[in-house]
């Protein structure tokens, strides 16, 4: 009997996640109970983008000695991250507002489980140092490379910037390229104009790229953590996930209280230059909280704007996919 394409794809993504993941961490799974639930047999796969969440957790050492197993699965952008999410290959995923909405349209099992508060200055439209482009108006008739894919926070920022100057998306030629590939091409001057986000944004700016417009006044600055329904419906996994979320909240508090220490660890773990790492950490979505009504309202406005701009094919009802409080039971 032949496997269905969807099953084969899921197995392939599980293998990718396993290769990308770090070795199992947390020591031997002891018979320890969290919130009355035995989590000793649980293994969580924690998705990540460009190593940011892992760097935070390891810098603050919040996952040391947990009573369950976990491993990291790192992806270069939201598109491949949410492909793994949809396949059930990961239990937790961090992403910006619009990628979460984009993923939700293709994945009815996706749920938002936490809010992370950052800065809209963590992304922007950049050009080469010698570029004649200096304002958004100068983009008209030119090619703009957007990372990572359709439905990214950078696409939302680009469209918002164009609208400010009376331009339409059709006034530029938009091309989508994954950020690692786009970074290499921008460094080689094969890309002239790039709409991207941290850490890639912070890195190229420190290397001399000129900022045409950042996300201030356009993007929300919010990011989110999501989890699949299957994970949330598994009592032991949900208990372990609730514990991870609480620990990540503490990690964010530590990083905000020790910015220099965190920047140093972040630079070491990601191999970014210290100056770029310091910039990125200062803008990063570190403060974490349960999803509030205000967060839902902000994300709903993003969803409605993105649908009006045809970035999203239809409206997303944010309240229907948000879990205000992920408890262990």
Residue ranges and their predicted role:
Residues 306-329:
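Conserved C-terminal helix/tail region of periplasmic/extracytoplasmic solute-binding proteins
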Residues 234-311:
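Secondary-structure end/capping motifs
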Residues 180-268:
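Pocket-lining segment of extracytoplasmic ligand-binding domains
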Residues 1-8, 16-23:
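N-terminal secretory signal peptides
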Residues 130-137, 167-168, 230-241:
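Short helix-loop capping/hinge motifs at secondary-structure junctions, enriched
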Residues 35-165, 175, 192-195, 210-219:
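Short, glycine-/small- and polar/acidic-enriched structural segments
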Residues 89, 94-97, 104, 143, ...:
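Sec/Tat-exported extracytoplasmic proteins
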């Amino acid at each position: 009997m032949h496997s269905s394409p969807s099953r084969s794809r899921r197995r392939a993504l599980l293998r990718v996640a396993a290769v990308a993941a770090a070795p199992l961490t947390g020591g031997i799974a002891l018979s320890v109970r969290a919130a009355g639930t035995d989590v000793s047999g649980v293994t969580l796969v924690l998705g990540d983008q460009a190593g940011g969440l892992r760097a935070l957790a390891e810098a603050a050492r919040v996952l040391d000695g947990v009573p369950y197993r976990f491993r990291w699965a790192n992806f270069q952008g939201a598109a491949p991250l949410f492909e793994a999410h949809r396949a059930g290959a990961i239990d937790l995923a961090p992403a910006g507002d619009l990628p979460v909405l984009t993923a939700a349209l293709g994945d009815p099992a996706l749920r938002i489980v936490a809010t992370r508060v950052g800065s809209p200055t963590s992304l922007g439209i950049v050009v080469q140092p010698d570029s004649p482009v200096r304002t958004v108006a100068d983009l008209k008739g030119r090619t703009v490379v957007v990372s990572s894919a359709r439905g990214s926070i950078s696409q939302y920022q680009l469209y918002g910037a164009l609208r400010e100057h009376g331009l339409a998306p059709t006034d530029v030629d938009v091309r989508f390229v994954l950020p690692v590939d786009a970074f290499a091409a921008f460094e080689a001057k094969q890309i002239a104009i790039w709409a991207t986000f941290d850490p890639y944004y912070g890195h190229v700016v420190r290397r001399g790229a000129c900022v045409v417009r950042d996300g201030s006044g356009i993007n929300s600055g919010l990011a989110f953590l999501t989890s699949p329904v299957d994970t949330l419906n598994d009592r032991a996994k949900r208990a372990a996930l609730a514990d991870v979320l609480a620990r990540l909240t503490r990690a964010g508090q530590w990083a905000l209280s020790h910015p220099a220490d965190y920047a140093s660890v972040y630079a070491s773990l990601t191999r970014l230059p210290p100056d770029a790492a310091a910039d990125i950490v200062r803008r990063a979505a570190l403060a974490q909280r349960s999803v509030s009504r205000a967060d839902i309202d902000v994300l709903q406005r993003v969803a409605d704007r993105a649908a009006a701009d045809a970035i999203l094919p239809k409206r997303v009802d944010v309240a229907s996919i948000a879990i205000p409080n992920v408890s262990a039971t």
